[in-house]
C-alpha cells in the first residue's frame, strides 16, 4: 500500500471514531440558562424566535443561483482557446437557457411577487 492510501485510511478512521464519540458521549442537561437566548448579559426582551419571510428566502436563493451562473460563465472567454470553441459556446448557451427557463417558471408560479 502506498503512503497516500495509508493517509486516506488513517484520516477516515480517525474522523469516524471522533464522530461516533461525539455522538455517544455528550451529556445534555438542559436548564433555563442554556435554553434562553444570550443578550449581552441582559434579560431577554422578547422571544428569540422571530418570523422569517419565505419570499425573502426564495429571492435570496434565486440570487445565489444567478450569482453562481455568473461565476461559472466568467471563465468561458478563456475556454474558447481550446480546440473546439463551438462546444464551449453550446454548453454556455444551454446553461443560460436552463437558468432562464427556471426563472420564467418561478415568475409564472408567482414566486417573485411580493404582494399576494
Curated annotation (Swiss-Prot):
Presence of the UniProt keyword Membrane in the record: yes
Main location: mitochondrion
GO molecular function: NADH dehydrogenase (ubiquinone) activity
UniProt catalytic activity: a ubiquinone + NADH + 5 H(+)(in) = a ubiquinol + NAD(+) + 4 H(+)(out)
Alphabetically ordered keywords of this record: Electron transport, Membrane, Mitochondrion, NAD, Respiratory chain, Translocase, Transmembrane, Transmembrane helix, Transport, Ubiquinone
Keyword presence, Translocase: yes
Annotated transmembrane regions: 4-24, 56-76, 87-107
Protein EC: 7.1.1.2
Membrane topology listed for this record: Multi-pass membrane protein
Gene Ontology, cellular component aspect: mitochondrial membrane; NADH dehydrogenase complex
Localization of this protein: Mitochondrion membrane
Similarity comment: family membership: Belongs to the complex I subunit 3 family.
PANTHER family reported for this sequence: NADH-UBIQUINONE OXIDOREDUCTASE CHAIN 3
Role: Core subunit of the mitochondrial membrane respiratory chain NADH dehydrogenase (Complex I) that is believed to belong to the minimal assembly required for catalysis. Complex I functions in the transfer of electrons from NADH to the respiratory chain. The immediate electron acceptor for the enzyme is believed to be ubiquinone.
Name of this chain's protein: NADH-ubiquinone oxidoreductase chain 3
Organism listed in the record: Petromyzon marinus (Sea lamprey)
